[in-house]
């Protein structure tokens, strides 16, 4: 047999090479031979939504800050039965004693007028707060006021000058109203639980005062010290809370408060008075979700 020519050898090699034909998978037709749709080997994109971020709004917080108060004039009633004294001084001018304006480190931590807050939010809107306001309520000396009632068993209506030897009356180590507040929260900017968000708070509540009494009536001092649950008080407040760096925040609050004090110790008797004030406070706090 004669040898293959080069052209014939090339043709024979070409005919013996296997040919692979790639057929595209038609996912729209059923595999008749198997009786079921063909298997789609491609990767499917999940239609399930990603898990939601925490939106319960539950949050715990605590803060410390300082306050200043503007007091309305007040009437103060004095009762000293064994001395025959039962009189009221009217429209008395009152002042506070901030302390922190002298410098935050000029006094010990609890000497200035301070605020202490603990609370929690149940959800994005509602929360509760325990608020202790260490405020100072001091009768201004060297003022002349109207007095009505009896003194030494006799009528004593007329004007009286409140000099140091007549009256020195103050809740200087704290009028100390304690409030149990309900809080409503509105988010103004930012996301919950993140740094850089701002919220507005409305608060209202009630409670009782725990004053530290210190006074002198007609030159005789009282047995000074703390008294507990000496009346009742209510408040309403608006505040802005700025969460600068998680979990820390600053809060600025303006509140109106009313307190009724009774059974305040004086020499051989008691006194009672009402406190009406507007109070501004600023606080530094921490919160945890």
Where are these regions (language model features)?
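Predominantly the C-terminal beta-signal and adjacent terminal strand-loop region
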Residues: 74-77, 82-88, 239-289
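Extracellular loop and loop/strand-boundary signature of outer-membrane beta-barrel proteins
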Residues: 49-50, 101-104, 164-170, 218-227, ...
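Short glycine/proline- and aromatic-enriched beta-strand/turn motifs that initiate or cap beta-hairpins
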Residues: 19-120, 211-213, 281-289
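Residues that define the transmembrane beta-barrel architecture of outer-membrane proteins
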Residues: 58-60, 110-114, 172-178, 198, ...
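Bacterial N-terminal signal peptides
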Residues: 9-18
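Flexible, solvent-exposed coil segments and beta strand-coil junctions
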Residues: 91-99, 156-164, 213-221, 262-266
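Gram-negative (and chloroplast) outer-membrane scaffold detector with strong preference
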Residues: 58, 117-216, 285-289
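Outer-membrane beta-barrel translocator domains and adjoining extracellular loop/strand segments
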Residues: 74-80, 141-147, 212-221, 263-269
